[in-house]
């Protein structure tokens, strides 16, 4: 099983969201969930939309943690996991870059992301 990460905008007047982009690495394994939550200090929930101004802060924290303290987070990676600290770094960087690319045309506080 894997997550599906998407970037969305909220449709005015109806409270619904429309996917506008997805990162290059948009389907990381569920096995990496504990590692992501730990390094980003973010207990994200599936099915919930998060404003990207907040998400970018958490992604930046996670990227720094994985770059400078990889061994601390490696222990959260399951033994039989397909992921690694390096691939986790690629995933978080991919999500951040996708958000920032959308923010070139849409204000960051108007963009949302979802881990599904």
Predicted features along the sequence, with ranges:
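Acidic (Asp/Glu-rich) sequence patches and key acidic residues
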Residues: 1-108, 112-116
């Amino acid at each position: 099983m894997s997550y599906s990460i998407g970037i969305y905008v909220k449709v005015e007047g109806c409270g619904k969201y429309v996917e506008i982009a997805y990162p290059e690495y948009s389907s990381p394994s569920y096995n990496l969930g504990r590692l992501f939550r730990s390094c980003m200090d973010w207990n994200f929930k599936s099915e919930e939309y998060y404003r990207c101004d907040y998400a970018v802060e958490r992604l930046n924290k996670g990227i720094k943690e994985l770059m400078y303290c990889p061994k601390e987070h490696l222990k959260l990676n399951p033994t039989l996991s397909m992921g690694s600290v390096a691939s986790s770094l690629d995933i978080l960087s991919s999500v951040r870059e996708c958000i920032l690319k959308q923010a070139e045309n849409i204000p960051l506080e108007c963009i949302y992301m979802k881990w599904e």
